[in-house]
Amino acid sequence: MKPLTTVDGLVLPLDRSNVDTDAIIPKQYLKSVKRTGFGPNLFDDWRYLEPGEPGMDHSARKPNPDFVLNAPRYQGAEILLARKNFGCGSSREHAVWALTDYGIRVVIAPSFADIFFGNSFKNGLLPIVLDEAVVDRLFQEVEATEGYRLKVDLAEQTVTTPSGEAFPFEVGEFHKYCLLNGLDDIGLTLQHADEIRAYEQRRRAEAPWLFR
């Protein structure tokens, strides 16, 4: 997993509350567990004018010109600005994979669904909760200013605007450690590889019949 320390990125404003995981990545795309390849189907039902299916050439599909993800000014965004209860619905981890595969590294919202919030940290995505009044302000600034960027500093736990105003955010120490060091569940386990090997060797000597 790629470490996340600071993100100085273009902001994509998704001005919708209660965005559920089926909207983030529709159910027909959940057949793979590779964690990659989901970016073209992020917000699929809103992003394209006709329904999509796995295996389609999505570059040939007609984009919805009214959906914010297709606006040229937001191409290459790394920070998603959202409304309350982002990521509600089913617990599909694919929703986080779709966001990260598209290039999103940070999601800022007034609140998140609990399961989505936990899945985000396990997959290198930083969910930041800011006060709803602050989020309202950020939406106004993003929509009024083309090329609007925010700087997210995980070590300092701040979100800084182009004017230099910094908003603090909370993150658990364990989640912070994992993101800063690029550690998912497998990476955390591999940190103890020497101890695991030593235990296996000891058990093999103590109870060889278990390994026959």
Curated annotation (Swiss-Prot):
Heterodimer of LeuC and LeuD. Its EC number is 4.2.1.33. This is 3-isopropylmalate dehydratase small subunit. It comes from Thioalkalivibrio sulfidiphilus (strain HL-EbGR7). PANTHER family: 3-ISOPROPYLMALATE DEHYDRATASE SMALL SUBUNIT, 3-ISOPROPYLMALATE DEHYDRATASE SMALL SUBUNIT 2-RELATED-RELATED. SUPFAM superfamilies: LeuD/IlvD-like. Pathway: Amino-acid biosynthesis; L-leucine biosynthesis; L-leucine from 3-methyl-2-oxobutanoate: step 2/4. Keywords: Amino-acid biosynthesis, Branched-chain amino acid biosynthesis, Leucine biosynthesis, Lyase. It catalyses: (2R,3S)-3-isopropylmalate = (2S)-2-isopropylmalate. GO terms for molecular function: 3-isopropylmalate dehydratase activity. GO terms for cellular component: 3-isopropylmalate dehydratase complex. The keyword Cell membrane does not apply. One of its GO terms (biological process) is L-leucine biosynthetic process. Belongs to the LeuD family. LeuD type 1 subfamily. Catalyzes the isomerization between 2-isopropylmalate and 3-isopropylmalate, via the formation of 2-isopropylmaleate.
